[in-house]
Amino acid sequence: MTTATFGTNQVDWEQRLDFDKLRTDRLANLKRELNKSDVGALLAFDFANIRYMSSTHIGTWAIDKAIRFALVTRNSDPIVWDFGSAAKHHKLYNPWLDTTTAEADADPHAPHHGAVKPRAESGARAGISTLRGAFNPDAGIADEVASKIKRELEKFGLLNEPLGIDIVELPILFALQRAGITVVDGQQIFLNARAIKTGEEIGLLTQAASMVDAAYEKLYEFLRPGVKENEAVGLVSKVLYDLGSEYVEGVNAISGERCSPHPHVYSDRLIRPGDPAFFDILHSYQGYRTCYYRTFAVGSASSAQHDAYKRAREYMDRAIALVRPGATTADIVAVWPKAEEF
């Protein structure tokens, strides 16, 4: 049975993807891996890890700035430090940052029902990092970041435990170390948490892929001699954004003699009759991304192209047959030809 797909809207007459469950399950996965590890807390600067942890998003313009950061500890729920305007927006529209399931994080005086309690302090806070060095070190921002993190670790009794970080700028690392915090690699904890997808995550990945299906249909109609690779990129980007993509990360549009070796970047090359043309469409829908390839023959395919397609299809079918829980990439590549054979 395939994964169901729905419209991109929410409706009152049909149960679709449950975003509350998505948020709850992701945090539960992360806390499970955190509690299995040797670290007391996780600090994230990576855009995707912040979103996975806290379900906050401020637009993909900030994806490479390393200016936002988020912390989750064994004894508390996520805290996100963000631009002041963004922090205020989170406070208004991200109510999950004001509740917790952790006793040490809860407001002991606030009434509550069940396991979810109001927090003693909001998880939506104003605060920024060094913007990849754009702020002069004399401003002392790195030490301010370290001070914020140290306060939370002290508050929750974890100052003497290692702090796992996904990525970090050196001024921040040095400031944390000066504050007496032991910093270790936290990337694998995030990766372990994200490895097994929830039902909602699979649904979002399927929805993201279905949007690329639509883009490829338009691309099939568009491809002909005389159009350029960059025009194909523009077409795909428009289709995806019109369908609700939040970020078209890239479209590899590669044709003719540019197909081998793969240059990983499109050009303004004119597509010619009989060209092979392959595409890789990378985009994000609700934070779930595609890397979805398709190859076309422009006009008609030669006998050599037919033979190459047949061989490639056989390789793919062998690999797909091995995809199951517990399989590794080593199992897959074992049935593929060695690179030297090409």
Predicted stretch roles:
Residues M1-F342:
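Active-site neighborhoods and metal-handling regions in enzymes and metal-associated proteins
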